[in-house]
């Protein structure tokens, strides 16, 4: 039995010796800190706690912060957090340090994954709600021919651009698997091209909205002289060569991962991001001039056209910062701390996915012309069906009283 226990005892002794050597080494380091510190009053001596954190000599009444341990019992921890321990007024350490900020890296990754999964749900929910609202708005502009003026045609095209962008977003999410993403097949690159094209058209149609309002209000130029083809060129045609140039750049300099994302040191995405930033800045200038004119010259005016312009400006003032802020989020890197990353994930997911919903609300559902036309259609439908109901009731009257009265008339005439 003694012979059987001897190897085990030797192993235990070796491990104990190793731990003792490590603790002695750490203790020596802490004692070195003790000798290097100069305190005249009461102070806590340098010491090592049970976890292995070295606490330097500290003046009484002070709180000490030390980095979290990198490893403990084979588990890796995030060293960006701190451990806190108080040196009491009597020169003795608190019983144990506060390790609340020291979190396992795997545990943090699990938390981040949970938040990413929630963000994916928000994205799908937001894009679904946006797509439904945009389709309703599209049908309203399609059916209500009485309100089909240039201003509403621009709204209609903006809504169409958002519909196509949402559709291509769903196509990307449902078809671009990890295998397709890594293999960089042709069809997945075409899907990315389509999504980026419709993404750019959103901003150029917003630019068309700004051009129309700036021309009508600031330049006092008759909108009757503006032509639909001008805005079609701005919204649909100009983004096309921009995306073609971007695709050529991707093909030669960053031809991987379905052209989604970017390689470090390669800036081909700025081929389409640059024009988008430019039209956003121009739109901000347009809106500044429009608001200035409205506040100075049109404040006392109550004409119906001026009221429509004011409402359009309000909608654009709300939507343009919304679109601009969400786009600029791509250039913002969240901080290293967990809270800033979580806030960034949720904020970005919400604004990106609900853009189409906000566009349909401000440019269609809150549009007084659309609401008036829908109300007229509804009243016309009610009147039409009420007439049909009256005719149906008249046709359903029994004929027996008519025959009786006719027989009585015949008898009276015979008498």
UniProtKB/Swiss-Prot annotation:
Q: Subunit info?
A: Interacts (via N-terminal extracellular domain) with CRF and UCN.
Where does it live in the cell?
Cell membrane
Report the source organism: Xenopus laevis
* UniProt name for this protein: Corticotropin-releasing factor receptor 1
Q: Which UniProt keywords apply?
A: Cell membrane, Disulfide bond, G-protein coupled receptor, Glycoprotein, Membrane, Receptor, Signal, Transducer, Transmembrane, Transmembrane helix
Q: Does the keyword Transmembrane helix apply?
A: yes
What are the cysteine partners in each disulfide bond?
Answer: 30-54, 44-87, 68-102, 188-258
- The signal peptide, as residue positions, is 1-24
Q: Which CDD domains match?
A: 7tmB1_CRF-R1
What the entry lists under InterPro entries is as follows:
GPCR_2, GPCR_2-like_7TM, GPCR_2_CRF1_rcpt, GPCR_2_CRF_rcpt, GPCR_2_extracell_dom_sf, GPCR_2_extracellular_dom, GPCR_2_secretin-like, GPCR_2_secretin-like_CS
Its lineage reads: Eukaryota, Metazoa, Chordata, Craniata, Vertebrata
Predominantly, its location class is membrane
Q: What Gene Ontology terms describe where this protein resides (cellular component)?
A: neuron projection; plasma membrane
| Description of its domains | The transmembrane domain is composed of seven transmembrane helices that are arranged in V-shape. Transmembrane helix 7 assumes a sharply kinked structure.
The protein's job, in short, is: G-protein coupled receptor for CRH (corticotropin-releasing factor) and UCN (urocortin). Has high affinity for CRH and UCN. Ligand binding causes a conformation change that triggers signaling via guanine nucleotide-binding proteins (G proteins) and down-stream effectors, such as adenylate cyclase. Promotes the activation of adenylate cyclase, leading to increased intracellular cAMP levels.
Q: Which residues lie on this side of the membrane: Extracellular?
A: 25-111, 175-189, 254-269, 332-338
Residues in the Cytoplasmic compartment per record? 143-149, 219-225, 296-306, 369-415
> What GO MF terms are annotated?
corticotrophin-releasing factor receptor activity; corticotropin-releasing hormone binding; corticotropin-releasing hormone receptor activity; G protein-coupled peptide receptor activity
- Origin: domain of life: Eukaryota
Q: Does the keyword Chloroplast apply?
A: no
């Amino acid at each position: 039995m003694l012979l059987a226990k001897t190897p085990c005892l030797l192993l235990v002794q070796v491990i104990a010796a190793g731990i003792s050597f490590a603790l002695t080494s750490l203790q020596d380091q802490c004692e070195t800190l003790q000798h290097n510190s100069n305190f005249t009053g009461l102070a806590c001596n340098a010491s090592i706690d049970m976890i292995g954190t070295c606490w330097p000599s500290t003046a009484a009444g002070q709180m000490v912060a030390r980095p979290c341990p990198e490893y403990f019992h084979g588990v890796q921890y995030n060293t960006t957090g701190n451990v806190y321990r108080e040196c009491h007024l009597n020169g003795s350490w608190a019983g144990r340090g506060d390790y609340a900020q020291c979190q396992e890296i795997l545990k943090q990754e699990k938390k981040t994954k949970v938040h990413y999964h929630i963000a994916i749900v928000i994205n799908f929910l937001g894009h679904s709600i946006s797509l439904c609202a945009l389709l309703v708005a599209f049908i309203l502009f399609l059916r209500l021919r009485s309100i089909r003026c240039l201003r509403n045609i621009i709204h209609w095209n903006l809504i169409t651009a958002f519909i196509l962008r949402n559709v291509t977003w769903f196509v990307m999410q449902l078809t671009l698997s990890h295998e397709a993403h890594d293999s960089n097949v042709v069809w997945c690159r075409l899907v990315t091209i389509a999504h980026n094209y419709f993404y750019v058209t959103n901003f150029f149609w917003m630019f068309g909205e700004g051009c129309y309002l700036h021309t009508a209000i600031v330049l006092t130029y008759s909108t009757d002289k503006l032509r639909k083809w001008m805005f079609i060129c701005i919204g649909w045609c100009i983004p096309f060569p921009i995306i073609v140039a971007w695709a050529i750049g991707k093909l030669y300099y960053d031809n991987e991962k379905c052209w989604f994302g970017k390689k470090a040191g390669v800036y081909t995405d700025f081929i389409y991001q640059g024009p988008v930033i430019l039209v956003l800045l121009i739109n901000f200038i347009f809106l500044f001039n429009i608001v200035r004119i409205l506040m100075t010259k049109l404040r006392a005016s109550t004409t119906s056209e001026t009221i429509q312009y004011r409402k359009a400006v309000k909608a654009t003032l709300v939507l343009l910062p919304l679109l601009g802020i969400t786009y600029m989020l791509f250039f913002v890197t969240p901080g290293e701390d967990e809270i800033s990353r979580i806030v960034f994930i949720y904020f970005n997911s919400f604004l990106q996915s609900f853009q189409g919903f906000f566009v349909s609300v401000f440019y269609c559902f809150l549009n007084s012309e659309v609401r008036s036309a829908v109300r007229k259609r509804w009243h016309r439908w009610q009147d039409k069906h009420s007439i049909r109901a009256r005719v149906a009731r008249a046709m359903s009257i029994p004929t027996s009283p008519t025959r009786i009265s006719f027989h009585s008339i015949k008898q009276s005439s015979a008498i």
